[in-house]
Amino acid sequence: MDSSRILKYESRLNFGSLCARRIRAKSEIPAVVYGKESDVLHIKIASNEFNKRFAKFTDNTVLILSDGKVERCVFIKDVSENITKGLIYHVDFYEVDRNRDIERYIAIKFVGASIGVKEGGTLSVLRTKIKVKALPLDLPEFVEVDLTPVKKGHQITFKDIVLPENVKLAEEDENLSILLVK
């Protein structure tokens, strides 16, 4: 397993504003883990570790929460922060079964300069996300689409996107255009 995904946590029994302030005073972040098939778990995580490693998370960032005994596969669902102070106040994690495929929308990252645009064409982006199906730990945070070979009058559809191994297209119509050059 990729150790960069692992985030250590400790369970906590005390809740409320006062307890949350005490946790933050110890350079920790109060958090909660919930999911469809699991009870709500109140935890605390090290602030510096979370800020350092996961400052630029996406909706598809998959983490492994570990207390040394139990590992939980989670997505970061929500982060409450004080922007003026630069502090994270609370994190919500959503637990999923790491052995079951899930469907998620992931970002499409366009790279390169289209030949058609260089010839005077106009690039129209119709979709910026794609629905895929994969195990949580195989889920990419984004897919890259190279625009370089796209000529004037051509388009790219969902089926043209090259997905990583173990990731399947979950769109209903794979022939829908994601971009075209006019």
From Swiss-Prot:
Listed GO biological process terms: translation
Gene3D superfamilies from the UniProt entry: Ribosomal protein L25, beta domain, Ribosomal Protein L25, Chain P
Protein name: Large ribosomal subunit protein bL25
Protein family per UniProt: Belongs to the bacterial ribosomal protein bL25 family. CTC subfamily.
Function: This is one of the proteins that binds to the 5S RNA in the ribosome where it forms part of the central protuberance.
A Pfam family: Ribosomal_TL5_C
GO-annotated cellular components: cytosolic large ribosomal subunit
Summary of subunit composition and partner proteins: Part of the 50S ribosomal subunit; part of the 5S rRNA/L5/L18/L25 subcomplex. Contacts the 5S rRNA. Binds to the 5S rRNA independently of L5 and L18.
Keywords associated with the record: Ribonucleoprotein, Ribosomal protein, RNA-binding, rRNA-binding
GO terms of molecular function: 5S rRNA binding; structural constituent of ribosome
Cross-referenced InterPro entries: Rbsml_bL25/Gln-tRNA_synth_N, Ribosomal_bL25/Gln-tRNA_synth, Ribosomal_bL25_b-dom, Ribosomal_bL25_C, Ribosomal_bL25_long, Ribosomal_L25_dom, Ribosomal_uL5_bac-type
Keyword rRNA-binding: yes
Signal sequence coordinates: none
Keyword field contains Chloroplast: no
